[in-house]
């Protein structure tokens, strides 16, 4: 059920991603973020009302998750595409690290606060906190000036042509193409395996639901540490090499998790934290790399393409991971996925066009 809920929240975003990217590069990015946040809040408000009048069904939840995904398809690329218009180029990776800190804090505090509030109030009232948060975000954007990239005057604009241009920006750059390919391949294994973490706690380590929740929080704590490392200063390092090292580190944590004994829950928690660190460092390095190497006027399309290309194979993995875990077992699934991610990381180091990308002058 969790896998299908995740698919409901990802499928619309992946389908319309290339279209939204072209629109983001065409429209006012500040307004896009404000409207997207408002739309997402409206979906949550409708769900709260359905619970309040006691008619909420599973299909309502899945449908509204899908609608929220449409809002996210606009919001996330617009936000990432706006950062280079506000910050110096040499600070972009550091800012991406700070964003990882913010995301990690919300991932740690959000579930904990939600679990506490659900014991006090009904779910419809708890959902209103999400609505209130969106209203605060939209209001704060009123006071922020976000410039839009310069557009060529007198040029006929065609959305399909702009989508093709976004794809060609990636394909024409061999280094960027390889990095995208490796990222898509890794996402195919990382995102589905993340669904198995609670099952590892409950079924393999014979843990409790509380311990399963702790593991989810520990990943976010690791991501918080990784974000803090990347946000602390500007590092003079090849970001492509850093991304590849994080592939190896993340794959190793999955592989070692698969060989742990049933009484190795503490080590599972340690490996989960390290995996969280690797994920945050990777995300900060990758985001900063794209923001540095791509013109601001095309970033909406490139980020949308990236999200789409990453999410589609990840969803295929989500569909198949249950069958894989049932057929091979939980630990074998971790060992297999971790080993493949390590192989991808090694292959990435042996790809000269990708390794040269962050050495090239902008």
Which residues are covered by each model-predicted region?
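C-terminal transmembrane bundle of multi-pass solute transporters/carriers
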Residues: 15-18, 26, 32, 164, ...
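Alpha-helical transmembrane segments of multipass membrane proteins
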Residues: 45-49, 112-116, 138, 255-258, ...
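C-terminal ends and interior cores of transmembrane alpha-helices
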Residues: 38-55, 249-262
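Juxtamembrane intracellular "pre-TM" segments in multi-pass secondary transporters
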Residues: 147-181
């Amino acid at each position: 059920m969790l896998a299908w809920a995740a698919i409901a929240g990802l499928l619309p975003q992946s389908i319309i991603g290339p279209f939204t990217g072209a629109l983001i590069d065409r429209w006012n990015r500040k307004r896009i973020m404000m409207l997207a946040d408002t739309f997402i809040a409206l979906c949550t408000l409708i769900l709260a009302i359905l619970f309040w009048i006691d008619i909420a069904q599973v299909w309502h939840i899945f449908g509204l998750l899908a609608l929220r995904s449409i809002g996210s398809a606009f919001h996330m690329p617009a936000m990432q595409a706006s950062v280079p218009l506000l910050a110096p180029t040499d600070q972009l990776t550091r800012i991406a690290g700070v964003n990882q800190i913010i995301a990690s804090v919300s991932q740690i505090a959000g579930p904990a606060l939600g679990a506490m509030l659900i014991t006090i109030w009904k779910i419809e009232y708890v959902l209103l906190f999400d609505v209130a948060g969106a209203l605060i975000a939209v209001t704060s954007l009123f006071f922020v000036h976000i410039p839009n990239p310069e557009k060529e005057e007198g040029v006929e604009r065609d959305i399909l042509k702009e989508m093709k241009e976004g794809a060609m920006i990636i394909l024409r750059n061999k280094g960027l193409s390889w990095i995208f390919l490796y990222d898509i391949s890794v996402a195919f294994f990382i995102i589905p395996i993340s669904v198995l973490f609670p099952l590892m706690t409950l079924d393999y380590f014979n843990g409790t639901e509380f311990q399963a929740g702790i593991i989810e929080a520990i990943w976010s704590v690791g991501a918080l540490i990784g974000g803090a490392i990347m946000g602390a200063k500007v590092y003079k390092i090849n970001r492509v090499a850093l991304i590849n090292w994080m592939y190896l580190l993340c794959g190793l944590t999955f592989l070692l998790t698969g060989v742990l004994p049933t009484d190795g829950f503490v080590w599972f928690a340690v490996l989960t934290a390290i995996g969280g660190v690797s994920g945050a460092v990777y995300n900060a390095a990758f985001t900063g790399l794209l923001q540095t190497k791509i013109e601001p006027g095309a970033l909406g399309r490139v980020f949308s393409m990236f999200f789409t290309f990453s999410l589609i194979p990840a969803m295929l993995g989500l569909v198949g991971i249950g069958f894989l875990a049932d057929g091979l077992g939980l630990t074998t699934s971790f060992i297999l996925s971790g080993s493949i991610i390590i192989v991808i990381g090694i292959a990435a180091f042996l790809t000269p066009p990708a390794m040269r990308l962050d050495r090239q002058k902008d």
